[in-house]
Amino acid sequence: MSDILNKIVAVKREEIAAAQKKIPLAAMRADAESRVLTRDFEGALRAKIAAGQAAVIAEIKKASPSKGVIRENFIPADIAQSYAEGNGKVSAACLSVLTDRQFFQGQPDYLKQARASCALPVLRKDFMVDAYQIYESRAMGADAILLIAACLEDAQMAEFEAIAHSLGMAALVEVHDGAELDRALKLRTPLVGINNRNLRTFEVSLDTTVSLRKAVPSDRLLVAESGILTPQDVKTLRDADVHAFLVGEAFMRAQEPGAALAKLFA
């Protein structure tokens, strides 16, 4: 792992230890297992694609380590509603909400607020390094979790995926290169995200998705992540047979995020 990833993972482990002192694993698991109604994250993406539209996972993100504060006027419920409405014709399929506090200025309440304000399935965007977080994700209302291959061993990914599926959640596994993709394809989840941002250098290139696309089997649903800022970026990816996208920064900088989404994917 890179220095920044090592730092993030170390902080996560501290956060998990503190959280378990407040709510032990057994109690968190019981809470998660009591929440039986999830929204169909994968189904929402596939429905958009079947309708000939882009399947957009629209991100709610206040800040990032590389860009600092991205959106000052940050009201998750309003942003979620804007994404869900779009322009009436083009809108988000799902939401992604940052819950990491230290590096992205997120928090679990943002996910709860966003989910309560619309009917879209919600992905918890955070760095999962312990089974406790998977139960915690469902307890806070998440319909899907992110598994970042660069942060996890194969056994951890398989364990976390199994827990997520047992709770009715989807798992989006994120990769950046061919070796990580090979590992991701061993999992059961059909959701594979290719991050165009190198988490070691934070450099961004759409060529990452384009070059790896051919290695993704047709039964998997490929999601392009990061660096999608212009209609030409969207065209480049669509020409490579990519139909699902995770976009955040481009929308967060717009006064009306849903309108920006509709314009980008018109």
Swiss-Prot record:
Pfam families: IGPS. Its EC number is 4.1.1.48. The keyword ATP-binding does not apply. The keyword Ion transport does not apply. It catalyses: 1-(2-carboxyphenylamino)-1-deoxy-D-ribulose 5-phosphate + H(+) = (1S,2R)-1-C-(indol-3-yl)glycerol 3-phosphate + CO2 + H2O. InterPro entries: Aldolase_TIM, Indole-3-glycerol_P_synth, Indole-3-glycerol_P_synth_dom, Indole-3-GlycerolPSynthase_CS, RibuloseP-bd_barrel. Keywords: Amino-acid biosynthesis, Aromatic amino acid biosynthesis, Decarboxylase, Lyase, Tryptophan biosynthesis. Pathway: Amino-acid biosynthesis; L-tryptophan biosynthesis; L-tryptophan from chorismate: step 4/5. CDD domains: IGPS (cd00331). GO terms for molecular function: indole-3-glycerol-phosphate synthase activity; phosphoribosylanthranilate isomerase activity. It comes from the Bacteria. One of its GO terms (biological process) is L-tryptophan biosynthetic process. Belongs to the TrpC family. This is Indole-3-glycerol phosphate synthase. It comes from Paracidovorax citrulli (strain AAC00-1) (Acidovorax citrulli).
